[in-house]
A protein has these predicted regions:
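Short, glycine/acidic-rich beta->alpha junctions
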Residues: 20-24, 117-118, 182-186, 224-229
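Active-site flanking residues adjacent to catalytic metal/cofactor-binding acidic residues
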Residues: 97, 204, 338
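Aromatic/acidic polysaccharide-binding cleft in carbohydrate-active enzymes
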Residues: 203, 207-299, 312-320
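Carbohydrate-binding surface patches
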Residues: 316-350
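Conserved, mostly hydrophobic/aromatic
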Residues: 77, 93, 167, 236, ...
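Substrate-binding cleft and catalytic face of glycoside hydrolase catalytic domains
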Residues: 1-164, 168-174
Length: 350
């Protein structure tokens, strides 16, 4: 329920900060704090039939009916987590996940202008409450670039240059058959659009294109998938991306009442063994959080690249063989190559 009828005034006594959902969030933030991770806090949208959704409907999350109420609640959350709970790991926020399809008004996809209005309202509220400098705004968060268009990002970079600290996009269209040049071209367009606004571009989600609905990928248990993920990441970084985020770290349920079919089985490692009791993979699992083969390839990338590193692209004569050189802030170099072909490749570095 709403705290009051005045979005300009936060009634802290009406907020529930000890709910099961908040306790779950605290556990994740505690781990991030302990492991010195940097967190981007994303709100998916206004839940259907929630007071923030108002009359908007059409999916399990929709656009907020009132930007002012939405901004008040988002501000209250950030104030509580950073000022009261003292979480220093929260560095960035993304106000809505993939708004190009999820930002629904009256059951229909809203225009980009509606999303832009919300972001500007959020920026004003954070400034009013004195917390704007505490977190960066990662905006656009679009999925439409992944289906061959950059229109959503283009509109956001035009209209939110003075609001965003970074722009980000998601993609799941690249696979074993995708040449390096295609991946490079996709991200270069994102990079140039963001650069025109004076901001970096981050790939906030990426994975392969062997999708089975939103919760499965056919090649998830193959080592070769890890090599593909590295090849995609190399090309994204070579094209100018400020960073990449594989989706997702671990198998997970989005909702506690979801069916087994709804479990997101996209992780670098699995969830607890009992969660797979009805699956054919159950008998072969020996431990909780079993690591998938793709982890061993992808972690060769993530274990050696640190935030703030410089990227120096390495050209190769093969469209399915990618390389890059990374100079970390401590001056140490890392050379990364991903061979997506069936033939061995010789590497000579001089």
């Amino acid at each position: 329920e709403n705290d009051n009828d005045d979005p300009g005034l936060i009634n802290w006594d009406k907020f529930t900060f000890n709910s099961p959902e908040m306790q779950s969030l605290y556990r994740e933030l505690d781990l991030a704090q302990q492991q010195q991770m940097e967190v981007t806090l994303t709100l998916w949208g206004a839940p259907d039939k929630h007071f923030l959704a108002g009359r908007n409907s059409g999916n399990w999350v929709v656009a907020p009916e009132s930007n002012e109420e939405w901004s008040e609640n988002f501000s209250a959350l950030i104030q509580y987590l950073i000022k009261e709970k003292k979480y220093t790991c929260i560095k960035e926020i993304t106000p809505v996940n993939e708004p190009d399809w999820s930002f629904l008004v009256n059951g229909k996809r809203a225009s980009t202008a509606k999303y832009i209005e919300m972001c500007k309202a959020l920026d004003r509220r954070f400034k009013k409450d004195g917390i704007r400098e505490l977190v960066d705004f990662s905006l656009s968060d679009n999925s439409d670039g992944g289906i061959g268009t950059h229109k959503y990002l283009a509109a956001c970079t035009r209209e939110l240059a003075d609001v965003a600290d970074v722009f980000n996009s998601h993609t799941y269209i690249f696979g074993y058959e995708t040449p390096n040049s295609t991946i490079l071209d996709w991200e270069r367009q994102n990079y140039e659009l963001s650069k025109s606004a004076g901001k970096p571009h981050f790939v906030g989600e990426f994975g392969g294109n062997q999708c089975v609905g939103a919760a499965r990928q056919k090649d998830i248990n193959l080592y070769e998938r890890g090599v593909l993920m590295v090849r995609i990441a190399i090309n994204l970084l070579n094209a100018g991306a400020s960073g990449v985020s594989y989706w997702s770290l671990i198998d997970q349920y989005y909702g506690k009442n979801d069916s087994y079919e709804g479990m997101q089985q996209l992780g670098l490692w699995k969830y607890v063994k009992n969660a797979y009791a009805q699956d054919t993979c159950y008998e072969n699992m020996t431990v909780d959080y079993e690591v998938r083969p793709q982890y061993f390839a992808y972690s060769l990338l993530t274990r050696f690249i640190r935030p703030g590193a410089e990227v120096y692209p390495i050209s190769t004569p093969d469209e399915f063989y990618a390389g890059t050189a990374i100079k970390n802030k401590d001056g140490k170099w890392v050379y990364i190559f991903a061979n997506g072909t069936a033939q061995e490749k010789k590497i000579k570095i001089s």
